């Protein structure tokens, strides 16, 4: 793919997918790759992982998932690159790279968040890179978009 010629406008969905979010209100997704990543098995797994581990046992309102958090990070990254001076320095291919990296940044998290990592001496960042570059649905989607795109996204992590 010619990175310089890639245009986000040309690949937009005709109808954006809208996610209702407790923090950001509405999160619009209009890029097919982003929507495909959201629908992947690896991203959907994050719906069952609490953002704050076992904290919800003490604070009943601390119920949000890694999935919701990842959508929120995607939303903020998207807002930054389209509504600020930062975006002026990025071409559309770079913008999509940033949005994918933001969405996938926590995909390697296990149950009970960082407590699990501490107990078993694991690193979610390393698992995130393994998921993005390994034999996964996420990897296949990124590579289908453009050969080498999975490594480009993981290099941002």
How would you name each of these model-derived features?
Residues 104, 108-109:
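Short active-site segment of divalent metal-dependent hydrolases/proteases
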Residues 1-49, 57-99, 110-157:
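Sequence-structural signature of the catalytic-core scaffold of metal-dependent phosphohydrolases
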